[in-house]
């Protein structure tokens, strides 16, 4: 097992111009991490993304730092075959970015939100399309020696029951689960039970915690908004 850090942890510094993505492997190395994970390499074109990924990999290689995962956004539920083809093609390009980084794992989302009509109204309605498109991405990933995965993330596919059903529906040897230890509490699920359920399918792990509150804490608010009845006289 290797302990890594995500580039997302330094997002505010990168956004403020205090760090560049190319500098992150050294920072992670100096802090003491074994590896680093990158999120959505930016670029106006695929060529720019590949060039930046190659720069990052060269810096990591010089330090003996592994880039152990590449994490991207995606929506694998689409209303039409044409839209599905377009999104799958975009993810295949992202697989090439993962190759340029030297990452052996690529995590992608599966859906962002429920819709108001048709199959998009429920997770089960969307699942066949999501699974089919995830299979297509996984099959392309296999040609590149990459394992794809999805995360318990984004509310729609976050509880362990849905994530396990998605895993079974995709049914590819190089498709697994990125288990985020903390995210289950966001859908009112016991973390220990959920992690135990998905552990056999895990190919990558995010260690996260939350401060869980009862909802009964006293918090300041505007006058007359809560407990104290203010009236004009």
Regions found by a protein language model. Give the residues of each.
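Short, conserved active-site loops that position catalytic residues or coordinate cofactors/metal ions
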Residues: 7, 31-40, 69-74
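Glycine-rich, proline-tolerant flexible connector loops at the mouths of alpha/beta enzymes
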Residues: 35-60, 110-122, 215
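Active-site acidic/histidine proton-transfer and metal-coordination neighborhood
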Residues: 58-66, 77-177, 186-188, 197
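Conserved beta-strand positions in the central sheet of alpha/beta enzyme cores
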Residues: 37, 69-71, 107, 149, ...
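Active-site-proximal loop/turn and secondary-structure-junction residues that shape catalytic pockets
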Residues: 9-11, 40-42, 73-76, 110-114, ...
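A generic structural signal for short coil/turn motifs at secondary-structure boundaries
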Residues: 12-16, 45-47, 79
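Histidine-acidic metal/acid-base catalytic patches
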Residues: 1-34, 51, 57, 61, ...
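The substrate-binding groove and active-site-proximal loops of carbohydrate-active enzymes
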Residues: 42, 74-84, 223-224
């Amino acid at each position: 097992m290797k302990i890594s850090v995500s580039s997302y942890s330094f997002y505010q510094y990168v956004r403020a111009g205090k760090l560049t993505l190319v500098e992150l492997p050294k920072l992670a190395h100096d802090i003491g991490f074994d590896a680093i994970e990158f999120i959505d390499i930016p670029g106006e074109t695929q060529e720019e993304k590949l060039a930046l990924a190659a720069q990052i990999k060269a810096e990591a290689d010089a330090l003996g730092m592994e880039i152990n995962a590449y994490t991207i956004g995606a929506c694998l539920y689409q209303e039409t075959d044409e839209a599905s083809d377009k999104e799958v093609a975009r993810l295949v390009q992202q697989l090439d970015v993962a190759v340029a980084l030297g990452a052996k794992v690529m995590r992608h989302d599966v859906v962002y939100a429920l819709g108001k009509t048709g199959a998009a109204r429920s997770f089960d309605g969307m699942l066949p399309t999501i699974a089919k498109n995830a299979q297509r991405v996984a099959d392309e990933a296999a040609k590149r020696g990459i394992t794809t995965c999805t995360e318990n993330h984004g509310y729609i596919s976050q509880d362990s029951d849905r994530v396990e059903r998605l895993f079974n529906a995709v049914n590819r040897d190089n498709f697994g689960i990125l288990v985020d230890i903390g995210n289950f509490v966001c859908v009112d699920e016991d973390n220990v039970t959920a992690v135990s359920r998905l552990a056999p399918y895990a190919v990558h792990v995010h260690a996260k915690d939350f401060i869980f509150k009862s909802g009964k804490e006293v918090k300041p608010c505007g006058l007359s908004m809560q407990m104290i009845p203010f009236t004009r006289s």
